[in-house]
Amino acid sequence: MTDSGSAVRDSVLSTIGTIAQGASRFAYTVIVGRLLGADVLAATNTAFAVSILLSLLGPTAAGNAAAAFGGTGQTGRLTTKALTITMVWLSAILGAVALVTAHLLGGGGASSLMVAALTVSWSWYIFGRGVRFGMRQVPAVAVWDNVTGALSLVLLVAVILTHMTPLVLAPAVIGYGAFALASLVGARRAARRHDSEERPAPTQALAHFLIWSSLGLIATNGIMQVSMVFAAVFDSPARAGLFAAALSLATPLSMLAQAVTPALLPQFAQWSQLPHADRARSIRRATLTLTVLLGAGAAVVIAVLPWALPIVFGQDFAGAVPLAQGLMVAVFGFSLSVFLSAYLAAIGRARISTLATGTSALVGLMIMIGASIGLGGAVGAVIGTGSAMILSASLLAAISLWPGRKESVR
């Protein structure tokens, strides 16, 4: 199979797996909202937001690095080993930060511990996906996404039926943890089959990638997660619950770019070696394709939301419809930004990408604060996030097609 054909196959399989995991996450929130109410849904989605936000401080970038630079080759295996060691202490630190953050947001001891556990589990899940992608084990990712997604839903139903509401996050913790464990075990087995004399991993290039990729991910993804926390802090629990339902419906589309991007990182690395004209043609074609797919998906979702949302969550959540429709604009820009940021990082232009996304995030945050003063935290979160993501996607698209000097990684 050609490199392009392999990339397409990997993208399709990656998307299938992430759709399965995204569907299980969506079903998770629907079950919580339907059976436990808006207040518990708001708390649950806020916990997910905190976990994902903290994972942007290294684990997500480590997963991307494992996908881009890992593999079964000698240097790739050593790179994965170095990243795994980094993840051990990094996840411990982020778990402690999550514990404190959850407490500051009003969580009790048990709920704060669950948020910390979710942060650690999610961080290893994201890293495990990257390890699998780096070793070209994309079919395994799809299989385990399906298995662990189903496992988390079964456990969630069991938790609710046994009236153990304080443990509502435990099924997600177990599901993500099981995926991560399977990924690391699979990677270890693959490494044993390719034993050879070790040599130092490219630590300078790896550190550069981790730092700038993390900054770029925070700037790009952070505003989406901050919006949930913002709505929970600056609006009533009921309104925050409506925003949580809206965000739950908007999230699956955003996962498309997140699913495709890791599988394309090796292809991005190859594009970085091409002449500018060829590279620009490749990214232009890929960006146009993704834009059409995302635009069509967003339009369909916006059209069906007025009747679909009340059916899914119940009539009590009908007020979330305009919030969800507004968030679809944000998700459209977010998905393009994730894709383009990963491309720019892979070709050595992470700094200018981070500057663009960071500026967009700051502008969006200011708009979010201003709009919330008169319209409330939930509406302010929608307006601010949408503004940030559209500005980010526009700037990144312009940068991606602009002749630029490749940044040094030394």
Report each predicted region and the residues it spans.
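Membrane-interface junctions at transmembrane-helix termini in multi-pass inner-membrane proteins
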Residues: 72, 121-144, 329-358
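Interfacial segments at transmembrane-helix termini and the short loops linking adjacent helices
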Residues: 38-42, 102-118, 303-332
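Membrane-water interface segments that mark the loop-to-transmembrane alpha-helix transition
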Residues: 9-25, 47-106, 276-300
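Hydrophobic alpha-helical transmembrane segments
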Residues: 113-116, 142-192, 359-363, 377-402
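Helix-loop junctions and terminal segments of transmembrane helices
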Residues: 30, 58-74, 246, 250-274, ...
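Signature of the first transmembrane helix
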Residues: 5-60, 211-237, 365, 385, ...
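Transmembrane helical elements of multi-pass membrane transporters/channels
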Residues: 10-25, 148-152, 168-190, 199-266, ...
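Helix-loop interface residues and adjacent transmembrane-helix termini in multi-pass membrane transporters
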Residues: 35-38, 135, 161-163, 234-237, ...
